[in-house]
């Protein structure tokens, strides 16, 4: 169904900064072809096609969250996604007087040669160990912390840390959505710091530059939260008066 076409791509998204520039490219390209050649593909089909491009052709065993956010995201909304069922809902992104600030650390990042696929393998190993005794769990994110604690002696240290992080982070995500909907933005900011600490300590995907910058924000009054985002960028929640210091 595809005919000939010429394509020129321009973007102000930094490449390799971990803010889903590749998902933006693949999804934008898919939507463009869908319109140009009147392919009649649904948004969900475009998400799956764009995901397959990264998963099967590029070789990044990524989830579908980035592609889903690019295509289904709305202005001033946050998206809560169940990656198992692809059920989702949009909630209001009302951060009151606070601003969201993204910071590019300019540290080089190449996901294809990074630890991403290794972490995927480690999480699968953790789940396999758990399923030997608790086969009712299909996904690591669903496993309660107490079960992971009880099986600690069965894990290598790094695998134990990966399992613990995934279980806790899933709970933090649900709690974060609840806090935002209740307008508890300061408490949400606290969760961001908790997440970054465990991304660094237990999931081991941070770096010294990111850790330094997150710790530095704790000394800036009215910056209420900071964490790494995606690859090597940071996301902060701050009062507008502190943006220059960040």
Describe each model-derived feature in a short phrase:
Residues 236-239, 243-246:
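Single conserved hydrophobic/aromatic residue that forms the stacking wall/gate
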Residues 5-9, 210, 226:
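A short glycine-rich, hydrophobically flanked beta-strand micro-motif that places a catalytic Asp/Glu
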Residues 210-214, 230-235:
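Small/polar glycine-rich anion-binding or flexible loop at a beta-alpha turn
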Residues 11-13, 105-107, 232:
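Short, histidine-centered active-site or binding-site loop motifs used for metal coordination
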Residues 19-21, 227-232:
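Active-site nucleophile and cofactor-binding loops and adjacent substrate-binding regions
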Residues 77-225, 242:
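C-terminal nucleotide
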Residues 1-93, 219:
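Gly/Ser-rich oxyanion-binding loop with an adjacent helix/lid
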Residues 65, 192, 228-229:
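Methionine-biased hydrophobic packing positions in alpha-helices, especially
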């Amino acid at each position: 169904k595809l005919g000939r076409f010429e394509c020129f791509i321009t973007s102000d998204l930094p490449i390799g900064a971990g803010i889903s520039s590749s998902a933006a490219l693949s999804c934008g390209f898919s939507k463009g072809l869908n319109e140009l050649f009147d392919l009649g593909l649904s948004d969900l089909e475009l998400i799956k096609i764009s995901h397959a491009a990264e998963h099967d052709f590029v070789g990044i065993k990524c989830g579908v969250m980035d592609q889903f956010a690019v295509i289904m995201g709305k202005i001033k909304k946050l998206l809560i996604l169940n990656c198992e069922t692809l059920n989702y809902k949009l909630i209001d992104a009302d951060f009151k007087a606070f601003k969201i600030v993204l910071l590019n650390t300019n540290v080089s990042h190449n996901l294809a040669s990074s630890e991403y696929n290794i972490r995927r393998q480690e999480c699968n190993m953790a789940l396999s160990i758990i399923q030997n005794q608790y086969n009712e769990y299909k996904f690591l994110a669903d496993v309660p912390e107490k079960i992971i604690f009880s099986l600690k002696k069965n894990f290598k240290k790094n695998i134990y840390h990966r399992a613990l992080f995934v279980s806790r982070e899933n709970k933090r995500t649900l709690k974060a959505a609840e806090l935002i909907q209740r307008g508890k933005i300061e408490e949400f900011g606290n969760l961001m710091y908790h997440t970054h600490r465990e991304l660094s300590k237990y999931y081991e995907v941070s770096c010294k530059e990111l850790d330094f910058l997150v710790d530095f924000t704790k000394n800036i009054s009215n910056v209420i939260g900071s964490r790494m985002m995606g690859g090597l960028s940071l996301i902060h929640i701050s009062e507008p008066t502190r943006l220059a210091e960040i």
